[in-house]
A protein has these predicted regions:
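C-terminal helical cap
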Residues: 160-171, 176-206, 237-289
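Hydrophobic, small-residue-rich alpha-helical packing segments that form membrane-like cores
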Residues: 1-39
Length: 336
């Protein structure tokens, strides 16, 4: 991707173009984000970056979230229109050993991914390759691999569903990676696990959800459809964090989901219930509001699969400009 290798000067030139047309810039800068606050101050452009989330303590590959928050607060106090995105959801992806994308940074897995899928089981059975892969995953680069936070999500062995690999490895008297490989080989690598990589520190997430100058977001927005699905974030936020944990008032939470992003992205007359605005409304039963579980469907071309969260309980009606809409009645909103 050109944006991954662009210099800061090139990025600033692009930001100036966006600012000239009253547009917004989104970027995923990993740990190199402090310069965004300087660019925003120089150009007057609104910028949002992903992601301000918690990671486990001791992760040498990541700047601690409190340090990132401190940089944000300093830039925000100086007047920079920079809005990091936060979320209530754990950062998780689906891991399959047939296509182990979360491990692709390890050289052993680059070697594996170069093979045809039919040839990959034999490499997993190669003890020398497996030892190399195991050592690479245990290195500092992959310090975020927490085997206790990798849960079996799809398997032909029903008794393993929901179990974490750390405890399974103990029972099997194996290294966690070896345990994962053995389980996956038993069902021809169709096993899938949910791999939680961060943002599961409840205390830290609570603080970030109320942090000034942040946007609720970090949705996958349809990318990586077979690995993750964050469509349930608004429902989880209202049900689990507002209703159950009381992190903020319902009124404040609704504004966080509606008015704040609408104002940031320039969606005029949207996001608030005011005279003259579009009557975009969601009628929900807060007492019974329940997030949808994820499920896998195979409705893409050539039988491709994706994850969906379409079984929410407690959403009674959706109105767009005052009119009830069907489930698939939406369209993209643009600034004017």
């Amino acid at each position: 991707m050109p944006s991954a290798i662009a210099s800061t000067d090139e990025m600033e030139a692009l930001v100036r173009c966006a600012a000239a047309h009253d547009r917004v810039v989104e970027t995923n800068p990993d740990d190199e984000f402090a310069w965004l606050y300087e660019v925003a101050a120089r150009t007057g452009c609104a910028i949002t970056w992903t992601a301000l989330v918690t990671y486990p303590d001791g992760n040498a590959a990541r700047t601690h979230w409190t340090a990132k928050r401190r940089t944000h607060r300093e830039g925000w106090a100086a007047g920079a229109r920079v809005y990091p995105q936060v979320t209530c959801r754990p950062l998780s992806v689906q891991l399959s050993l047939l296509n182990p994308t979360p491990f692709i940074g390890a050289p052993a897995f680059k070697e594996l991914m170069a093979l045809a899928t039919a040839d990959r089981p034999s490499l997993y059975r190669d003890t020398a390759w497996r030892a190399r892969a195991r050592d690479e995953l245990a290195s500092e680069r992959f310090h975020q691999v927490r085997w206790s936070s990798i849960l079996v999500a799809e398997t032909t062995e029903a008794e393993l569903l929901g179990r974490d690999l750390a405890s399974l490895a103990t029972e099997m008297q194996l290294d966690p990676f070896d345990a994962l490989v053995e389980i996956a080989l038993r069902d021809d690598l169709t096993t899938r696990c949910t791999m939680i990589v961060g943002n599961d520190n409840a205390e830290g997430v609570t603080e970030l959800l109320s942090e000034p100058g942040c946007l609720l977001g970090i949705s996958d927005a349809g990318a990586h459809v077979g690995m993750l699905c964050d469509a349930g974030m608004p429902v989880e936020f209202l049900a689990l964090w507002v209703r159950d944990r009381g992190v903020m008032s319902l009124e404040r939470a609704v504004h966080r989901l509606t008015g704040e992003p609408a104002a940031f992205f320039g969606l005029h007359k949207r996001g608030t219930v005011t005279e003259g605005a579009h009557a975009d409304l969601v009628v929900l039963d807060l007492a019974h509001l329940t997030p949808s579980p994820l499920r896998r469907v195979y409705d893409l071309p050539a039988g491709g699969d994706r994850l969906v969260a379409d079984q929410v309980v407690g959403i009674d009606h959706v109105l767009v400009n005052g009119r009830p809409r069907a489930e698939r009645g939406g369209r993209v909103l643009r600034t004017v």
